[in-house]
Swiss-Prot record:
Source organism per UniProt: Mycobacterium leprae (strain TN)
Active site, UniProt feature: 212 (schiff-base intermediate with substrate)
Protein name per its UniProtKB record: Phosphatidylserine decarboxylase proenzyme
Positions of modified residues (Pyruvic acid (Ser)): 212
Named cofactor requirement(s): pyruvate
Family membership noted in the UniProt record: Belongs to the phosphatidylserine decarboxylase family. PSD-A subfamily.
Record text on cofactor binding: Binds 1 pyruvoyl group covalently per subunit.
Top-rank EC class of the record's enzyme: lyase
Pathways per UniProt: Phospholipid metabolism; phosphatidylethanolamine biosynthesis; phosphatidylethanolamine from CDP-diacylglycerol: step 2/2
């Protein structure tokens, strides 16, 4: 589900301060827990090893802490508030809009050869890497396609790189396709959506590890309201208005 800000609290003193810190620091997606734990394990091993051997292993502890901190930042899962008006399509990912054009949806979805409006978002290593539903509706297709791990910001990535495509149909019959695309560093696509799932706009449905790209295919005739070079915020930035 979409992560939304909590209601205002009436707590005071240390409890209020702790709550402010929690609200300012984004939670971590569960997919990041093993990576953070590994970094902390290295830190612990350095501490224990220094006690046992007497050797200076501060460098090992620092490496472990640095790795754990980096993973916590990468797997952050901040709150987002999707638009409340009907008929909008929001960005499925944080990042830079790198392509706005028309293209045929992935062949594995069997949607024919008609070109559809497409908006592509490139996620750098520093962006939030959870993906969110661009629109409310039912998942009617999920297809994984193996492929290369080329640079995700280049045009061939959409057709040649490893990808997972999700096709969503709204209650009114409109369809939107969102495609998770692997990149040079992104070697693991995680998709939690399954056929028959009912998604609400802004719901978290997947994650790509370490740099990637998201392609969103819009209904025929749709005019995107964003521009190439614009920053997109997953679950909040409106890509198009279908009304």
């Amino acid at each position: 589900m979409a992560r939304r800000p909590r209601a205002e609290s009436s707590k005071e003193g240390p409890a209020h301060l702790l709550e402010l810190v929690r609200s300012a620091v984004p939670p971590v997606h569960s997919a990041g827990h093993p990576f953070i734990s590994a970094g902390l394990a290295v830190t612990s091993a350095g501490a224990v090893g220094q006690v046992v051997t007497g050797r200076d292993l501060r460098w090992l502890r620092r490496v472990g802490l640095l790795a754990a901190s980096a993973c916590a930042v990468f797997f952050r899962h901040p709150s987002r508030v999707p638009p409340t008006r009907a008929g909008v399509v929001v960005a499925p990912a944080d990042g830079m809009i790198c392509v706005i054009d028309s293209a045929t949806p992935p062949a594995e979805l069997s949607m024919g050869n008609m070109s559809l409006p497409r908006v592509s978002i490139f996620l750098s290593l520093l962006d939030v890497h959870v993906q969110r539903a661009p629109i409310s509706g039912e998942v009617i297709a999920v297809q994984y396609q193996p492929g290369r791990f080329g640079a995700a910001d280049l045009a061939p990535a959409s057709t040649e790189n490893e990808r997972t495509s999700v096709r969503i149909r709204t209650a009114g019959g409109t369809e939107v396709v969102v495609v998770q695309i692997a990149g040079l560093l992104a070697r693991r696509i995680v998709c939690y959506a399954h056929i028959g799932d009912k998604l609400t706009i802004g719901d978290t449905y997947g994650l790509i590890r370490f740099g990637s790209r998201l392609d969103t295919y819009l209904p025929p005739g749709t005019e995107p309201v964003v521009q190439v070079g614009q920053r997109a915020v997953a679950g909040e930035t409106v890509l198009a208005d279908l009304t």
